Amino acid sequence: MKVCVIGSGGREHALAWRLSISPSVTKVYAIPGSAAMSDCAELVGIDWQQSDHLISFLKDNQVDLVVVGPEAPLVAGLADVLNKVGIPVFGPSKAAAQLEGSKVFAKNLMKKYNIPTAAYGVFHKVDEAKTFIAQIGAPIVVKADGLAAGKGVVVAMTVDEANEAVEDMLSGNRFGDAGSTVVIEEFMEGEEASLLAFVDGKTVVPMIASQDHKRIFDGDKGANTGGMGTYAPAPVLTDALRDEAMKTILEPMVAAMEKEGMPYVGCLYAGLMITDEGPKVVEFNARFGDPETQVVLPLLDSDLGQIMMACATGTLTADMVKWKDSSAACVILASKGYPETSSKGDVISGDIKQYDTTIVFHSGTKLVGENYVTNGGRVLGVVGLGKDLRTALDRAYGRIEHIDFEGMQYRTDIGAKAFK
């Protein structure tokens, strides 16, 4: 079958790469894709927002399935537009994508269906938010309601820091409409893990658990980012805890979405905190994580195209999804100034080819002449594969020694928590 991937980042590079080696897939298109994706997909210069052009292309080329990578097209309702004209989509409807698009929607739904998460309040006015902060005390978590590219969350260690975050979001207009409402949550103690699942509207099949590293610097210091590295499997989410998360979080949420009249199709991403009381929800995302995808998909031992089509057509079964008994680690190489700014146009030198045990996924690059240059905050995701995590990490970091660009920054402690 022919599959079209929407998006151009590291996650989409990983999706296109994995689909291109799936037996059921004969052709992969990418809209718009990136130059680096041309080794596994045909790039198509269409804007997904021009739905007439997009639909014409998909119909003319007899595309069987569309896989939407980023959150913005989902929250904008791209799946609805394509489903309406009979094109199967791996990705949720506009209504279902609110699970990521609105933190208030997600928190209220979790409360209604008793899905474990942090206690919270929702605020539009600065003074009311500050009163709540004074009552709860610090540490406390302040979140912008809408999409903020993974950066709309402040874990405030002091009341002053929390008040500043509230002012920044509600008065300072830091995230525009996304920050016109804030969710303030109790701080949860524990270790985070990402549990992604394939969903067809009813059936939920978990992927291998991974762990992201959100902060820019080693030791979880510095500003929040879109993610500086991941590894899988993550030992913090034992089989027993994964089963508990499925029973208390993912399965009830998918059942709730169906009951609410907005069945969920695609990848459901549960960001979890493993607390003393068991797994609790930090956030839901309505798509594959970036950079979780870069470690989860290389460990898949099944046909990704077949699984995604089954999700899109309501025919998913657990036996379709098998995993390799090995490990993967991804280290993000970011440009200078990230996450506050990003440097564009710095030439990337060294070896960025694909090998059996190391893969380089391009998050923010551009081909200028014969050279790739930086074109975003997160530039490359260097993935190491191995029989165990130590081997995978050694391969990823070993590969990084052969890659360079001006101001290149990365964390040296990805996966360290697994060896505690």
What label would you give each PLM region?
Residues 1-94:
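ATP-binding N-terminal substructure of ATP-dependent carboxylate-amine bond-forming enzymes
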Residues 152, 156-293:
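Internal nucleotide-binding/catalytic subdomain
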Residues 246-268, 285-355:
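Active-site "cap" helix and flanking loop/linker of ATP-utilizing ligase/carboxylase catalytic domains
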Residues 43-49, 121-125, 156:
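Short acidic-hydrophobic, aromatic-tinged amphipathic segments that line or gate anion-handling sites
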Residues 310-420:
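Peripheral (often C-terminal) accessory segments that flank ATP-dependent C-N-forming ligase machineries
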Residues 21, 36-38, 90, 112-114, ...:
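Solvent-exposed alpha-helices and their adjacent loops that cap or buttress functional pockets
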Residues 92-152:
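A conserved helix-loop-beta module that forms one wall/lid of the active-site cleft
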